[in-house]
Amino acid sequence: MDIDQYMTDLGRRARQASRAMARASTAAKNAALAAVAEAIERDAASLKEANARDVAKAREKGHDAAFIDRLTLSDKALKTMVEGLRQVAALADPIGEISNLKYRPSGIQVGQMRVPLGVIGIIYESRPNVTIDAAALCLKSGNATILRGGSEALECNTALAKLIGEGLEAAGLPQDAVQVVATSDRAAVGKLITMTEYVDVIVPRGGKSLIERLMNEARVPMIKHLDGICHVYVDDRADLTKALTVCDNAKTHRYGTCNTMETLLVARGIAAEVLPPLGKLYRDKQVELRVDAAARAVLADAGVGPLGDATEEDWRTEYLAPVLAIKVVDDLDAAIEHINEYSSQHTDAIVTEDHDRAMRFLREVDSASVMVNASTRFADGFEFGLGAEIGISNDKLHARGPVGLEGLTSLKYVVLGHGEGRQ
């Protein structure tokens, strides 16, 4: 296969389809989503057969249990796919919405209209559910998409692509609006991220090595985040019960997510009160603690151990594991300084009963999501009321934070006149 020619052809067809999608009615888009949901329910058995072949090959290659779990398309996963499609169909359609319409002294009206981005390339690892999630959001937001999933999920993704195509056709929409890259050749990724004439944005969903490669090689703009080094700062005016709840959930709810707390900062004035119960809680849940000297003194005195020594590297590490770095800081100033130095600008939280300090934390911490008295685990499109998300961005341009339907759109200016000319 000539990868260059193959990817160019996908891009050309996606660009053409994007024009039809931009003018597609809400009813047609929702009909397509409903048809895909029905097709998945109808063909669940064949989808599971395709997935079983992918899983068997992955086992032969020696992939670990966690990888196999992400790859496996269970009955629950299929049900979630179907529910997700119907939830996206129920979301308000942002396309064509005009906002901020104002009369100018010249007599014209100036406003902004929400429009699709165009063609979105999604690069992700071996999670079949992402194929449906990404296709649904791109479809509803009036975009065309090129999906490049992990090679280990190729058979299942191909089967899903067929059902998506059938759903689009049934609704009178172009099948090329959702295309799956049907090759495991890594050169396809290299071509996709440089096709600026056909692809408007890339959304990568994967590990750090994938994101770093794309950051180095991509010519197409990206919506992405590299790390999730999230902090919780427990202020010396924190409510102890709230602090325990937030810090427990932020770390132990799920270890392998980008919005999990990786560093806990505690004000010196409350360390002796909050660290012992937290330390015992983490110890009971088998969380490895890497602490600075001040935290060690408090925890050791309370009989909490074993304790590792936190290094400079720990403040910069996204563990994605039951490991937590803990540092005692003098005050809010020191906490903000530490966070802005080491945070990946993803999600950071403060626990405090002091309104002024909370507002200052919100203003001065330079992250995509900043929280007061709430777990960092809430940094999620569904929890934010977006209905669904295609990913999370910690960049400052275009979308920032969880990226839902609006994050896959842009604004253009519209002018309504009555024959005016500029004086």
Swiss-Prot record:
> What does the entry give for GO biological process?
L-proline biosynthetic process
Q: Which PROSITE patterns match?
A: PROA
Keyword vocabulary terms for this entry: Amino-acid biosynthesis, Cytoplasm, NADP, Oxidoreductase, Proline biosynthesis
| GO terms under cellular component | cytoplasm
Q: Which reaction does it catalyse?
A: L-glutamate 5-semialdehyde + phosphate + NADP(+) = L-glutamyl 5-phosphate + NADPH + H(+)
Q: Where found, per UniProt?
A: Cytoplasm
- What GO molecular function annotations does the UniProt record carry, in alphabetical order? glutamate-5-semialdehyde dehydrogenase activity; NADP binding
HAMAP family annotated for this entry? ProA
Could you tell me which PANTHER family the record lists for this protein?
DELTA-1-PYRROLINE-5-CARBOXYLATE SYNTHASE, GLUTAMATE SEMIALDEHYDE DEHYDROGENASE
Q: Mind telling me what this protein is named?
A: Gamma-glutamyl phosphate reductase
Instruction: List the lineage, top down.
Output: Bacteria, Pseudomonadati, Pseudomonadota, Betaproteobacteria, Burkholderiales
